[in-house]
C-alpha cells in the first residue's frame, strides 16, 4: 500500500486539501473525502459521462483522472453551479424544459453543457447534440436536454 499523498486544489471556489492514495480517482476523492456526492459514478470507464466535472475550466471524466492529477487545479462540480442559493441558468433551463427524469446523468450533462457554452456560446441544435453526445441518458430522449441548453445559451448570451 502506498503512502497517502498530500493534495491541494480549489473545488467550487474553495481551497481544499487532503491526503489520498496515489491511485485514488478524482471522483472518489470528491465523493468520499470531500462529501461532494453530486458527481456520479456510472460506468467507471469514462464512457457514460455521469462523472464529468470541470478541471481548470474544461470537461473531464473524474473516473479516469487520479485525484493527484488535480493537485493545484480548479475543479467545478455540480454543487458549485448555484450561487447564493440561486440556480445557474443551465439548472433553471433544465427545470423549465423538463430535461431530467431520474437525474443520474444530470450533473455530467450540466457540466458538459457548461463547457460547450464556454467554447461555443451560440450553438446550433446540431452542435448541442454533438456536444452532449459524450454523456449518456437513458430516460429523456435528449429533446428536453437540447431545448434546455439552447434556452440557457440565449439567456447566458444576453448582455448583463
Residue ranges, per PLM feature:
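Signature of N-terminal electron-transfer/Fe-S-associated modules in redox systems
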Residues: 1-160
Amino acid at each position: 500500500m502506498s503512502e497517502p499523498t498530500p493534495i491541494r486544489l480549489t473545488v467550487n471556489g474553495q481551497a481544499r486539501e487532503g491526503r489520498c492514495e496515489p491511485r485514488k480517482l478524482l471522483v472518489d476523492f470528491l465523493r468520499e473525502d470531500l462529501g461532494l456526492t453530486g458527481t456520479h459514478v456510472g460506468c467507471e470507464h469514462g464512457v457514460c459521462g455521469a462523472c464529468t466535472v470541470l478541471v481548470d475550466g474544461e470537461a473531464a471524466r473524474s473516473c479516469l483522472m487520479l485525484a493527484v492529477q488535480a493537485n493545484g487545479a480548479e475543479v467545478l462540480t455540480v454543487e458549485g453551479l448555484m450561487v447564493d442559493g440561486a440556480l445557474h441558468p443551465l439548472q433553471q433551463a433544465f427545470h423549465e424544459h423538463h430535461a431530467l427524469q431520474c437525474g443520474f446523468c444530470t450533473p455530467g450533462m450540466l457540466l458538459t453543457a457548461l463547457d460547450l457554452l464556454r467554447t461555443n456560446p451560440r450553438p446550433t441544435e446540431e452542435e448541442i447534440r454533438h456536444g452532449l453526445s459524450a454523456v449518456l441518458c437513458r430516460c429523456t430522449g435528449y429533446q428536453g436536454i437540447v431545448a434546455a441548453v439552447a434556452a440557457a445559451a440565449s439567456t447566458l448570451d444576453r448582455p448583463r
